[in-house]
Amino acid sequence: MKDKIVIKGAKVHNLKNVDLTVPRNEFVVFTGLSGSGKSSLAFDTLYAEGQRRYMESLSSYARQFLGQMDKPNVEYIEGLSPAISIDQKTTGRNPRSTVGTVTEIYDYLRLLYAKIGVPHCPNCGKEISQQTVDQIVDSVMKLEERTKIQVLAPVVRGRKGEHTKLIAHIKKSGFVRVRIDGEVYEIDEDEIKLDKNKKHHIEALVDRIVIKQGVEGRLTDSVETALKLAEGLVVINVMGKEDMLFSENFACPDCGISIGEISPSMFSFNAPFGKCDVCDGIGTLLEIDEDLVIPDKSKSIMEGAIAPWGEGRLKEESWTFGVLKALSKKYKLDINKPIEDYDEKTLNILLYGAPDVLKVNYVKDSQEMVFNHHYEGIINQMKRRYMESNSDYIKSEIENYMSNNPCPKCKGARLKKEVLAITVGNKNIFEFCSMPIREEVSFIDTLELSNKHKIISAQIVKEIKSRLEFLINVGLDYLNLAREARTLSGGESQRIRLATQIGSSLVGVLYILDEPSIGLHQRDNDRLIATMKNLKDIGNTLIVVEHDEDTIKAADFIVDIGPGAGEHGGEIIAAGSLEDIKNCKESITGQYLTGVKKIEVPKERREAGKNFIEIVGAKENNLKNVNVKFPVGLFTCVTGVSGSGKSTLVNEILYKALNKKINRSKLNPGKYKSINGIENIDKIIDINQSPIGRTPRSNPATYTGVFDIIRELYASTKEAKLRGYKAGRFSFNVKGGRCEACKGDGIVRIEMQFLSDVYVPCDVCKGKRYNRETLEIKYKDKNIDDLLNMTVEDALKFFENLPRIKNKLQTLADVGLGYVRLGQPSTQLSGGEAQRIKLAYELSKRSTGKTLYILDEPTTGLHTDDVKKLISILQRLTDMGNTVVVIEHNLDVIKCADYIVDLGPEGGEKGGTILCSGTPEQVAQNSSSYTGQYLKKML
């Protein structure tokens, strides 16, 4: 059994006692309908058990820091290797995380720049070299006479620890004072205790000198002593002013600016020596945004133009009104004039303050008084309140009027100017990281280095180049290393982790991947498959959960799980080669692979009318000042290779611009000149794959609103009326009807010391969530718990005579979710299922026919059979007169659209233009469109 993984009796989620044997060291694909149990078998069984066994091998001391993993519900698994999961979850929300840091390429770059980087003066740009003791003394002697200075030897710079031995060594060397974290201590007299978990700066105080004629000899001795003690560094502290750092290593002879010893940590935007001290290494600052303070400049102050003041602030007896009257008198500021008609000087006074003192008339205690008032301006006042306030509420209110802007000091580079003055091949580390990955490889190839530098950097350059090439092979050549990880799509972040794993060259590992083809254009699919095969060829087992036909055909072994979804799934329908799957009549996947089932091209398409939503001059990220039209009342697909600008155009500009204008959203859209045709829509809805709720309390019944009607129904029964129960009695979120032992959760958490927490059904309500009295109320012999455990299909039959409930449930069935239980916790729903519940909710609402729906890759997690259902829903929404805009790579969806907007031609800087737009047939005729070339085969 060494060459096989044997699973016996898997019962996780909907798996029905599954037995399966999978070959090791092969490329295996798990496929099946959305919700059939693929992820339950791959992630919740195989990966969970592989991880758990590895954790169990660690000591109990180590396990308490790592947290525990539950044992999956499976009899046994044989032949399991340590498992690594590469899933769709994005790489966290930390703004410090970049593509470079996630892939660890940035660590090698820091090493490269530290070893062969050429330092320049950050002021004059001149290449700088090491400073002698005489040069240091001459620079210090230029200070004004009678200036008091301290000569310090920086022995510790930003290192954790108590440093007891070091302080003892300083004392033994004859020094009586030491400066720690900016404070001077007497070594003999003061008790020095440092927090070992904090980073400290420790400097031995070598001498205190007053600058005057004839002091050069003493200063030279002191500087030499400090340089010797601190390995080439000396700090001159001008009493009451800032420190001057000198180095025997590098300094500018003209400007006198020194750079400390060049080390890899200098290039880290997380380390105190390297990071910009204004933005703290993040590259952006949260600042008051003028456009959010005055969202509508066509209004006057009296009409409520100043958003933070609200409507009720401008009563004539208010202090603000008194100040405005004084401004009006002194600076001719007309409070009844639209803000857009103010000249620049007047607007600046309103926002940033008046230079002169104002005389403000104000009625206080029924007595009119005149106050002298220095008006600081709306924005300056908000800044001050934000800085001074300790109230989280006030801070969060002011944050509504703030946005992230590039740091004024580092311009978004995150590092100090001294660090950015160090170059390799005339580029600093930020300039290198800002290049697209494909250009970085050619830059490294053409680097001209001295023989000495070639020898030093050979191994580092090899590591950087191989990792960059792995990123290119998974279709990410358009990204740059400075890109924030949180701005990546799920597919991009997964492929970055895949490239990182290939870079680590581990062997004998079980890799489990979740739809790596998501977000990838058909053109790049072959490279991705080759990359996965490469991972297998070096000696690993790959299990890939996938619906993509090319990936399924490329697999060595295929497992089809079904036959249906949810309670109708959880069984192995077929397992074997591609031919085995094709020959299995029960396999829906097989039927699509053989062409027995397929998604048909629509016989006729809707034609674009006269109405369009038009974006003019879009130039956010890589968009090159493009103009684009979206026909109103049509189903439009936005296509193009990965990184061509689809998400920027649709999510950052179209959605955010309309959301700001229609819903007065606080989020700023990307850069564009104007947007026309807004009058054609009255509502904009983004239907994404985020969960319908974050806790097990939210479920399909609560999200779609059907649970409110059901609770009213139970409250209207004869028994409920007799007992005086209202609809709230049947909610598990509030006191009254719910079981108070488990607070309506149905489960109770039992904490274990060295094992994972155990969740057991509540022994009071037996997992039913409600108390005994509530469960005694029945409708057609079913209590509220029985109802929540019904599938949508069963509930449809149960409520067939109640149209209000039936219509809402029917839309859930129409989107292919008949198998889902009404009370199924949202945490147990896949992204595709969550998105379809949102679609069902939209379908159940009364349509105005003027809604714009935006969907970003809705086929994620969907089997071809589910894609067929999705297309019919999108067509239904469009038939109701709505406008649907979808970002998609799936050719089945693209061929069914009425209209296509294709971006390209490539990703990153080589993208961002509109290649073509029109019907699928028109796009297919365009020879410069990659989408068109693949579409041609489908039509």
Curated annotation (Swiss-Prot):
Protein function: The UvrABC repair system catalyzes the recognition and processing of DNA lesions. UvrA is an ATPase and a DNA-binding protein. A damage recognition complex composed of 2 UvrA and 2 UvrB subunits scans DNA for abnormalities. When the presence of a lesion has been verified by UvrB, the UvrA molecules dissociate.
InterPro entries: AAA+_ATPase, ABC_transporter-like_ATP-bd, ABC_transporter-like_CS, ATP_grasp_subdomain_1, P-loop_NTPase, UvrA, UvrA_DNA-bd, UvrA_inter
Protein's recorded name: UvrABC system protein A
Stretches assigned to the ABC transporter domain: 309-588, 608-936
GO cellular component term, pick one: cytoplasm
Gene3D superfamilies: ABC transporter ATPase domain-like, ABC transporter ATPase like domain, ATP-grasp fold, A domain, P-loop containing nucleotide triphosphate hydrolases
UniProt binding sites for ATP: 32-39, 640-647
UniProt subcellular location: Cytoplasm
GO aspect biological process, one term: SOS response
Protein family according to the UniProt entry: Belongs to the ABC transporter superfamily. UvrA family.
Molecular function GO labels: ATP binding; ATP hydrolysis activity; DNA binding; excinuclease ABC activity; zinc ion binding
Quaternary structure annotation from Swiss-Prot or TrEMBL: Forms a heterotetramer with UvrB during the search for lesions.
UniProt keyword terms in alphabetical order: ATP-binding, Cytoplasm, DNA damage, DNA excision, DNA repair, DNA-binding, Excision nuclease, Metal-binding, Nucleotide-binding, Repeat, SOS response, Transport, Zinc, Zinc-finger
The species this protein was found in: Clostridium acetobutylicum (strain ATCC 824 / DSM 792 / JCM 1419 / IAM 19013 / LMG 5710 / NBRC 13948 / NRRL B-527 / VKM B-1787 / 2291 / W)
SUPFAM superfamilies per record: P-loop containing nucleoside triphosphate hydrolases
PROSITE patterns given in the database record: ABC_TRANSPORTER_1, ABC_TRANSPORTER_2
Zinc finger boundaries on the chain: C4-type: 252-279, 739-765
Name of the gene encoding the protein in the UniProt record: uvrA
